[in-house]
A protein has these predicted regions:
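N-terminal adaptor-interaction module of cullin-RING ubiquitin ligase components
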Residues: 1-248, 253-260, 265, 269-273, ...
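Conserved positional slot within leucine-rich repeat
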Residues: 72-75, 101, 126, 160, ...
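P-loop/Walker A phosphate-binding loop and immediately adjacent motor/lid segment at beta-alpha junctions
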Residues: 148-155, 201-208, 223-226, 353-359, ...
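Short loop/beta submotifs within extracellular cysteine-rich repeat domains
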Residues: 167, 182-184, 193-194, 238, ...
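Acidic, serine/threonine- and proline-enriched intrinsically disordered linkers and terminal tails
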Residues: 193-210, 430-489
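C-terminal interaction modules of eukaryotic adaptor/scaffold proteins
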Residues: 546, 568-638
């Protein structure tokens, strides 16, 4: 059967196995493939970002034919252009929209109501940072507008009101009162008042001057049976307030985000785990008063937990993970910036197949106590499930870790190793480095103990020295196994090697060949030359984001040769590359037609005239950062 005669439904099913970028390319084959690709994209609920510019009007009409359901409008204000964009969205996209994001917009109440009433199928609405809407306090103050809003928001399930400095009890009640099916709410970084009763015992919570926790409790009591997710990040919620919240009768939360709630205590978290045992996602990042006791309470009380974020807890140690084996459903664990965590307890749990969780995402970013031995053990244990691994700024890990990752984690899609300065070309290539330093300096040396001056031979640093982490047999088996190069991670979609300053062309040109790679950072690698740039471009032709800032040896010749292989590139950062000139911009504008943002800051060889010419050749939505270019301190938005 000829491919063009296949039913659209069959082609749609085939395309569903491809990445989004590949589906976009497939849509250019013919009309049938175009409609099939649009169907598959619509099923993924792809979010379309639409800036408030005159050039967006034609785009909106085009999106209407695709019946898109998720839209984010940016840079809206009271200008005529913004009103035209709102009118176009209301007319062409409104009837089909299910998700609408207006984050940070400065639109008027009239424009908002006009847009809202044109979207009767909304299930998600993001008004975070839209302070102009709430400044006057008159939003939804008229009976007729309330009735219209109720009809428009009858299916709304998710509402984001984060970072609204003028949100009050009155405006909160008006807005949530129009959404009877609301199940998810964000009040992150709002000025909630805790600890006192501004109403002095009255139950008439309608202040136009403040947003009170008592009013939030009233709302939760009314919606307890259907409410599922709450975000109070960046608020001053106290332990007594947490007690009142988790004990609301009938409330069964599934997700709770409490980032940077610095007044929460271990006791508050214990109460949370006791009264909300059905939580599947908990984020306690930056709750600085929490310690091991809180982590132990989570392990003991939240057996259904799938996502746990404990980043930036400076009091958390490995002891807090003694009970982590109880979290059998855990899929995501974030321990970034926990400076006292080495991962030893997690290693013990993961070493036992009957105890280890099926972790898909693990972050040890900025955990300076993490060692190669722990990485090796975790890589072996989590091989079947792990897809995302973040070891950024784990300054103690070496080539042993990268070779363990390449050998045992072939299904990784995201790997972040930024600022791991001990990584070398040998590690990426999977070759054992000859220790010339040891052979040269193997003679006697002074001991470090000045109280017992003498001579000794420095002991060899073997992984077998830590029996808690890796047994002798396991270590020997690993050493006998053929070392894999980084190229073994064939499914990588994101790779960050920023500031791994010992890496050179020797490894980059040979191993950075990933057909599915979409994001790559090679910034602050001073030894990289045009050879690496060309090799990366040819080996990673699906790249959408590339960062090579402060790679001082890159020249125009490299970009002229590489640009034709980077046709899908959308974001490029080459700031601080001092040898680049306008020829690089000419090559990029000619070949990288999908580019959305470019950073050429501190590229002294590029002039403002070059940028003006680049502006004329690329689509208007491209943003160019050009600080300190040609001696100027300017930032162009084209």
């Amino acid at each position: 059967m000829e491919m063009q005669r296949l039913p659209v439904e069959v082609i749609t099913y085939i395309l569903s196995f491809l990445p989004i970028a590949d589906r976009k390319e497939a849509s250019l084959v013919n009309h049938t493939w175009y409609f099939a690709a649009q169907d598959s994209l619509r099923q993924e609920n792809i979010l379309y970002n639409i800036p408030a510019t005159s050039s967006s009007l034609a785009t909106i009409e085009s999106l209407a034919r695709r019946r898109v359901s998720c839209v984010s409008l940016t840079s809206l204000d009271s200008s005529t252009v913004s009103r035209d964009v709102i009118q176009a969205v209301s007319c062409h996209l409104g009837p089909h929209l299910q998700s609408l994001c207006l984050r940070g917009s400065s639109l008027t109440e009239t424009s908002f109501m006009h847009l809202l009433l044109a979207c009767p199928c909304l299930s998600s609405l993001d008004l975070s940072g839209c302070n102009s809407l709430f400044m006057s306090g008159t939003l939804l103050s008229k009976p007729e507008t309330i009735g219209q809003a109720q009809r428009a928001l009858t299916n709304l399930q998710e509402l984001n009101l984060a970072s609204l400095r003028y949100l009050s009890d009155l405006s909160f009640n008006r807005l949530t009162g129009c959404a009877p099916r609301l199940a998810r709410l964000s009040l992150a970084r709002c000025h909630l008042t805790f600890g006192f009763d501004p109403y002095r015992g009255s139950s008439n919570y309608n202040s136009s001057a403040l947003l009170s926790f008592r009013n939030l409790l009233r709302f939760l009591k009314e919606r307890a049976s259907s409410f599922r997710a709450l975000d109070l990040s960046g608020t001053s919620i106290t332990s007594p307030a947490m007690r009142s919240l988790v004990q609301v009768e009938g409330l069964c939360l599934q997700e709770l985000v409490l980032q940077n709630c610095r007044d929460l205590s271990n006791e508050a978290i214990s109460l949370l785990c006791t009264h909300q045992p059905h939580l599947t996602a908990l984020d306690l990042t930056g709750c600085s008063e929490l310690s091991d006791q809180a982590a132990l309470a989570v392990s003991a009380g939240l057996r259904a937990l799938q996502s746990l974020c404990l980043g930036k807890l400076q009091r958390l140690t490995d002891r807090g993970f003694l009970g982590i084996a109880e979290l059998r459903s855990l899929q995501r664990l974030d321990l970034s910036e926990c400076s006292l965590v080495s991962g030893s307890e997690l290693v013990k749990v993961c070493s036992a197949p009957e105890l280890r969780p099926n972790l898909a995402s693990l972050s040890f970013a900025f955990c300076c106590l993490l060692r190669d031995s722990s990485v090796l053990s975790l890589a072996r244990s989590l091989s079947p499930s792990l897809r995302v691994l973040d070891l950024s700024s784990c300054v103690s890990i070496t080539n042993v870790s990268i070779q363990a990752i390449a050998s045992h984690l072939p299904r990784l899609t995201v790997l972040r190793l930024a600022w791991c300065k001990e990584l070398t070309d040998w590690g990426l290539l999977g070759i054992e480095e000859r220790n010339h330093h040891r052979e040269k300096d193997a003679g006697p040396q002074f001991s470090r103990n000045f109280g017992n001056m003498g001579f000794f031979l420095p002991p060899l640093q073997n992984l077998e020295q830590d029996p808690k982490v890796l047994s002798d047999s396991a270590s020997n088996e690993s050493r006998k196994q053929h070392r894999a190069s980084l190229q073994a991670l064939e499914q990588l979609q994101e790779l960050d090697l920023m500031a791994c300053s010992k890496l050179t062309d020797c490894s980059i040109t040979k191993v950075i060949r990933f057909p599915a790679l979409r994001r790559l950072s090679l910034s602050l690698l001073p030894e990289l030359t045009d050879a690496s740039l060309v090799a990366v471009a040819r080996g990673c032709q699906s790249l959408e984001r590339l960062s090579m800032s402060h790679c001082g040896k890159l020249t125009d010749k490299g970009f002229i040769e590489a640009a034709s292989s980077l046709r899908r590139l959308q974001h490029l950062v080459i700031s601080g590359c001092s040898q680049l000139t306008g020829q690089t911009l000419e090559a990029i504008s000619r070949e990288c037609r999908q580019l959305k943002s470019l950073d050429v800051s501190m590229c002294h060889g590029i002039s403002m005239a070059d940028i003006a010419l680049f502006q004329a050749q690329l689509p208007l939505q491209t943003c160019v950062q050009s600080r300190f270019v040609g001696g100027a301190d300017l930032s162009f938005t084209l």
